[in-house]
């Protein structure tokens, strides 16, 4: 029996192991909707990996909203790929190699979360609202029973990785609009070559500085960002040149200040909040936001490289 058919007989909370510690999203808060309330019994998140999907398992990509610029559409789900390969081997070798159903279910659920994140990013790029009906029809399909869980995880991932939140403006029609987290007036999509929102990284850097006090040494910033697989001097598929983004772009946008530590020899540098950040938000709001979406007092971040949407044809 296909996994999609078998999964309809499972409960959302069954078979989901705690992965929030790895993702830093246990207890993450999605928009206060009936979907999130229904999913509250399952507070863990399933790890999602984006990259290239094996051709044999490539799903039909969600239809791009009208007016949306092209986003990369190919995705990769190693767990799903492994489950698929194991299933193929089982057909040849017999039931002894049948994959663990729990692992296969987790991987398939992760796939749906990733597909919904991708669909919502397309909607955000097009500056269009989104309805529950669109999400069900374009992405979720016969996984409708698991929609509360899928929606909650996708919403939390948008907040932490991309700095975007969904706000329900019509509870009856289940209509949602997008907003930048913390009410920031910047999302990182300014410019012709900006295909991914970067407010998530900005908020993380602001949180690191706030946690350190009034300023944070540059080496501390890169130490923290290394948890996201974001490194100084290494080109990133989402961020481009991270060093340039932090020391030039965010500085030019007046969200960060980058200065030499007085009296340092050899020269050392540090980051401070810029005037625009001080006007639009506060230390308390930023730290509260990070604690809320990471599910505890210790801020941890999912690897951004696992959320990369690589170049592909729309």
Curated annotation (Swiss-Prot):
Phenotypic consequence of residue 176 to A: Abolishes HLA-A1 binding
Start-end of Low complexity biased regions: 21-44
Residue ranges occupied by any MAGE domain in the UniProt entry: 109-308
UniProt superkingdom: Eukaryota
Region (Disordered): 1-99
Coiled coil (residue ranges): none
InterPro entries reported for this sequence: MAGE, MAGE_N, MAGE_WH1, MAGE_WH2, MHD_dom
UniProt keyword terms in alphabetical order: Tumor antigen, Ubl conjugation, Ubl conjugation pathway
Pfam families: MAGE, MAGE_N
SMART domains in alphabetical order: MAGE, MAGE_N
GO molecular function annotation: caspase binding; histone deacetylase binding
Tissues/organs with expression: Expressed in many tumors of several types, such as melanoma, head and neck squamous cell carcinoma, lung carcinoma and breast carcinoma, but not in normal tissues except for testes and placenta. Never expressed in kidney tumors, Leukemias and lymphomas.
Biased composition, class Basic and acidic residues, residue ranges: 1-20
GO (cellular component) term, any one: endoplasmic reticulum
Ranges that cross the membrane: none
Subunit structure: Interacts with TRIM28.
Function text: Activator of ubiquitin ligase activity of RING-type zinc finger-containing E3 ubiquitin-protein ligases that acts as a repressor of autophagy. May enhance ubiquitin ligase activity of TRIM28 and stimulate p53/TP53 ubiquitination by TRIM28. Proposed to act through recruitment and/or stabilization of the Ubl-conjugating enzyme (E2) at the E3:substrate complex. May play a role in embryonal development and tumor transformation or aspects of tumor progression. In vitro promotes cell viability in melanoma cell lines. Antigen recognized on a melanoma by autologous cytolytic T-lymphocytes.
Protein name, entry field: Melanoma-associated antigen 3
Species annotation: Homo sapiens
């Amino acid at each position: 029996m296909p996994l999609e058919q078998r999964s309809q007989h499972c409960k959302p909370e069954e078979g989901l192991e705690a992965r929030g510690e790895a993702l830093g999203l246990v207890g993450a808060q999605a928009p206060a909707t009936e979907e999130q309330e229904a999913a509250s019994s399952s507070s863990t998140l399933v790890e999602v990996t984006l990259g290239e999907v094996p051709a044999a398992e490539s799903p039909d990509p969600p239809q791009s909203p009208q007016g949306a610029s092209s986003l990369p559409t190919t995705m990769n789900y190693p767990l799903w790929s492994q489950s698929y390969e194991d299933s193929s081997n089982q057909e040849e070798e017999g039931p002894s190699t049948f994959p663990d159903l729990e692992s296969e279910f987790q991987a398939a659920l992760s796939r749906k979360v990733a597909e919904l994140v991708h669909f919502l990013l397309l909607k955000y790029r097009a500056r269009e609202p989104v309805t529950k009906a669109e999400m069900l029809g374009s992405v979720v399909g016969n996984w409708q029973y698991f929609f509360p869980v899928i929606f909650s995880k996708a919403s939390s991932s948008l907040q932490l990785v991309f700095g975007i939140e969904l706000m329900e403006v019509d509870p009856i029609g289940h209509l949602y609009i997008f907003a930048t987290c913390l009410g920031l007036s910047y999302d990182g999509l300014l410019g012709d070559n900006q295909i991914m929102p970067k407010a998530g990284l900005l908020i993380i850097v602001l949180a690191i500085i706030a946690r350190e006090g009034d300023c944070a040494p540059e080496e501390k910033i890169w130490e923290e960002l290394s948890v996201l697989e974001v490194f100084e001097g290494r080109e990133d598929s989402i961020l481009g040149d991270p060093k340039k983004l932090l020391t030039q772009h965010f500085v030019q946008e007046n969200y960060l200040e980058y200065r030499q530590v007085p009296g340092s020899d050899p020269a050392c540098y540090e980051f401070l909040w810029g005037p625009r950040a001080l006007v639009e938000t506060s230390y308390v709001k930023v730290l509260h936001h990070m604690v809320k979406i990471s599910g505890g007092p210790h801020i941890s971040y999912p690897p951004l490289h696992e959320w990369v949407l690589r170049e592909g044809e729309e």
